């Protein structure tokens, strides 16, 4: 078995509280990337486009409270701006899904979600397999799915797009996609995972019931196709 980290990885993760605190120090105090979080958080390539705290939060190596107070210290000594606001917002969003789980219990695992929607969903194994393997009609989806398979990581922007494609375009039972994420993600958290999948799939808390335009998203967030080329390079020949 090859345990080497893929050289393309945006997040060569190492577990434990010591590594979590090291990441906090680097992202906040040494590189001061927190000051630019709002502008970079939808990035796709590189280790510093987002905070990458989620795996350590998921396994308890660091707490939201610890990160929150470190942000407050940063705001006092370095800078308070929209970026510091947005990182706090994301911590609150994460806790919000925990409260959704507490309120609704096992409904988060039901096909109709917390809204108890009666939609028709498919469950084709071949469609699911092609999605997992990055073999769909959308290169942007494929690149993100290959990144997940190779590294256990996917950007927030990527997760929204592949989930929307799975549930809204392929009409597949969203829980199948959520379960695959559960099996693959370094930062799997039951509340965030199933909460976000419900949200994207139209059976959760989003009142707009949106469907992502995958090609528009790719053009906006990967306009030069750098991310797609990075992960699809081995599938072009």
Question: What would you call each of these model-derived segments?
Answer:
Residues 1-35:
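Long hydrophobic alpha-helical segments that form multi-pass transmembrane helix bundles
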Residues 7-11, 15-19, 38-237:
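C-terminal catalytic domain of photolyase/cryptochrome flavoproteins
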